[in-house]
Amino acid sequence: MSNPTSTTHHNIEIQSQDVIKLILQFLKENSLGNSLTALQEETGINLNAVDSKETFLNDVKNGNWDSVLTVVSTLRLSTTLLMDLYEQIVELLHLKEYELCKYLIRKTEPLNYMKLNQQERYLKLENHLQREYIDLGDFYKYGITTEKRRKQLIEQLNNEIITVPSSRLLSLLSQSLHWQKHQGIIPDDCMEFDLFKGEVPFKKIESEEEQITTVLDKTIKFNNKNKPETIKFSPDSKYLLTGSMDGFIEVWDYNTGKLSKSLAYQSNDDFMMHDDAILCIAFSKDGEFLATGSLDNKIKVWQIKSGKCLRKFEPAHTNGVTCLQFSRNSTQILSGSFDSSLKIHGLKSGKALKIFRGHQSFVNDCCFNHDEDRVISCSSDGKIKIWDAKSSDCLQTITPTSVVTVRDISIRSITILLKNPEFLLVCNSSQISIVSMKSQTISKTFTSENSKTFLVCTLSPLQNYLYAVDEDNILYTFDFNSGSLLNKFKIHDQEVISISHHPTKNLLATTGSDCLLKIWKSNSNDNINN
């Protein structure tokens, strides 16, 4: 093992030797003697700590040698001190513990060392053992009594051993968890925590049986300066987030329709924010991290629990950032922009790793495919492009042909289908289509009445239902499998800007130019077949 070094965290130097000592103490307290010995030998670092120095030294003072030798076996003391300690077994001879003395004299390492290096001293012990008798007054040097000899040993031991509180490793970990709770990094109601991964164990959240949303549940009012430009439910089902015109990112409790009180930074009016309007929001798969893109060309990455900005890309593009997606392992972010390009950014390096150029207008949406070896994008130029994620080469462009009836008009969004990832749900202005990426053919279409333009659309979590809003602010609900229209009604008085479905509940959030955010729920008495 290499020599331990020190590590500096926020100007506090942490010695690696101290970390090893914490582990040594843990091994000792949990009776893992073999591991304790192996780690001490490999690192050359010794614990030399006792639970209670006072108790240990009192055992020496009172001649409780069974307790003393048990503790000493876990320490790394100097050879001189060990020989002095083991020599004190003459007291056991005085108590006629002959067999024990014989074992200690002939089988222990300190006395074997004495035999090889201080023969006269060793033979003195051996001779007394053979006679099975000892006069301690004759054995000690002139004027030394048993009590004085024990006092000398106590002084020697006092210089080589230390005492530390028990369970230091667990205590420090506990303090760390309490601090993270105080900072909002760990939820207050958290009862389990994976120390190794540094996260709350993932628990699968049971999804409600999917039903269409028809009933207005909550309404949140904004004004023209702070109205949301984008909204999204978190994948861990906890929050609804809004990104607003004034640059604020707010985390809402969708059950109450109010700002979440579980996040300390929001309670202190310390919000996540940009200097300009927020255009897009994306979550990491586990919901721990948030990426936001703004009109002033910037991307910021946040930890939702603490509200801290972890990474900035300034600028990320030469124009506003319109769409974002995390890679599956949350180490990269894919972005699209008004500047017609896409980029992959590295969260560790803080740099753009790849750039994709080829669209002739705004990039409106982008995503990785399932294997993350392809990037898929759509644009206001009416084209869908499929890119090689490593080389940045455009591998395929889906454009109108005599076979493909997708019109050469703005494509607002794309969604990969769960059951068949070779197909895309494509939201065009005039219709919503299911398009094969291989054949570039349309297998199904969804249209509004009187060919009204679609503004936004989203799928239910299991992709049983398609929700789409047209320019008259009518919400259309389609059976995604059959294509039949199940319901339609007006949801806003002005243009709908953004839409998001809850990942496990029958909740749909919408926001519009009327400065309202509305949350819709299902009515369990609805007969969706009517």
UniProtKB/Swiss-Prot annotation:
Organism: Dictyostelium discoideum
Any Pfam family the entry gives: WD40
InterPro entries associated with the record: G-protein_beta_WD-40_rep, LisH, SMU1, TPL_SMU1_LisH-like, WD40/YVTN_repeat-like_dom_sf, WD40_repeat_CS, WD40_repeat_dom_sf, WD40_rpt
Protein name: WD40 repeat-containing protein smu1
Keyword Cell wall biogenesis/degradation: no
Keywords assigned by UniProt, alphabetized: Cytoplasm, mRNA processing, mRNA splicing, Nucleus, Repeat, Spliceosome, WD repeat
One BP term from GO: RNA splicing
Gene Ontology, cellular component aspect: cytoplasm; nuclear speck; precatalytic spliceosome
Origin: domain of life: Eukaryota
Domain spans labelled LisH: 15-47
Oligomeric form and interacting partners: Component of the spliceosome B complex.
UniProt lineage: Eukaryota, Amoebozoa, Evosea, Eumycetozoa, Dictyostelia
